[in-house]
A protein has these predicted regions:
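Lipid interaction determinants
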Residues: 16-74, 88-149
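Bacterial Sec-dependent N-terminal signal peptides
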Residues: 1-25
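Short, conserved beta-turn/loop elements at beta-strand boundaries and strand-helix junctions
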Residues: 82-87
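Conserved hydrophobic positions within beta-strands
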Residues: 32, 79-81
Length: 149
């Protein structure tokens, strides 16, 4: 009887936790900047690479290609979140690998927090897994770089 009462009290709480942990597609929408953690000192470096996940299910990745500040879209297409940890991107345009056009790319992701996205994937036709880390770009005043006071 005590076990039954315990289960009746705990089961709904476990269900609430599962619901709270589920990732909603809206939480991925926005502008993300790629970062890289230095292997020597652990410092996080901002890369000149951004990904835009739009509410209409389209995405694009762009970067600054040279010191003059020229930017280009490197990849674009559509995306769909298939579960709490998987996105499938359908590539409709790519300057980095034109053979990807028309193909699907499965991304395994994890939100470390609301503003940090960790992604791993294998590009179609490749055997090595890639790992990326992205941070959300927000409407806020720029922070001072570390070391400048």
């Amino acid at each position: 009887m005590k076990k039954l009462l315990f289960l009746l009290l705990v089961a709904p709480l476990m269900g609430l936790q599962v619901m709270a942990d589920s990732v909603k597609p809206e939480s991925l929408k926005g502008i993300w900047q790629q970062v890289q953690v230095s292997r020597t000192d652990g410092h996080t470096m901002l890369l000149p690479v951004w990904k835009v996940l739009r509410s209409d299910g389209t995405f694009s990745t762009f970067l600054i290609v040279n010191r003059s500040g020229q930017s280009v879209i490197t990849n674009e297409g559509t995306y769909k979140m298939v579960n709490d940890s998987t996105i499938v991107e359908h590539i409709t345009g790519s300057i980095t690998d034109p053979q990807l056009m028309g193909k699907d790319n499965q991304l395994i992701f994890r939100l470390a927090d609301n503003d940090t996205l960790q992604v791993s994937y294998k590009m179609p036709g490749h055997t090595r897994e890639a790992h990326e880390k992205w941070i959300r770009v927000k409407l806020e005043r720029p922070r001072k770089p570390e070391g400048n006071h």
